[in-house]
A protein has these predicted regions:
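Loop-helix junctions at membrane interfaces
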Residues: 1-165
Length: 165
């Protein structure tokens, strides 16, 4: 008979996946669009999504917040609080939508549908998030953000989420 607490084991595994996420972003990050270098791809959401499907959407959100804060204060410190907020909004939406859908349909087809819906939700939520938050932290006028919203910001978010799904 084992004396280990299942919740403690789950948290330990969650911690390992969060650490992997931070290591991945340390080694792999690059801009997808040369005209918007502040929009960088990184694979950090892959371990977070694994945690979400393995342990549930609330654990995925917990991992998202921890990873976003640690990355924002260390590996990606140049983004500061702006990067932390945007990461939590994007990945948080992704894990909650995909995680809750997958909880209802734990099949391969259910996982694919959940991931697709998560990708779409990510893309949709980041449009108003960029319009509201980006001007505050970057000083870019709303008109400049609006001009790149459909040709750059939406495709970037769909590409990043799609690859990480």
């Amino acid at each position: 008979m084992s004396n280990t607490n299942p919740k403690l084991g789950r948290l330990a595994k969650l911690g390992l996946l969060a650490a992997l996420s931070i290591v991945l972003v340390f080694f792999i990050h690059f801009p997808i669009f040369p005209t918007a270098k502040f929009l960088e791809y990184d694979p950090a959401d892959i371990p977070i999504m694994i945690a979400t499907f393995a342990f549930g959407p609330w654990y995925g959100l917990m991992a998202t917040i921890v990873v976003a804060v640690v990355q924002g204060l260390t590996v990606r410190a140049s983004g500061g609080i702006y990067g932390i907020i945007m990461h939590i909004i994007a990945t948080g939406t992704f894990v909650l939508v995909a995680g809750f859908l997958y909880q209802k349909h734990k099949t391969k087809k259910g996982a694919l549908i959940a991931l697709l819906c998560g990708v779409v939700a990510w893309g949709l939520i980041m449009m108003p998030a960029n319009l509201i938050i980006t001007p505050i932290f970057t000083g870019m006028p709303v008109e400049a953000i609006r001009a790149i919203l459909l040709p750059i910001i939406l495709p970037f978010n769909l590409i990043k989420a799609g690859i990480n799904a």
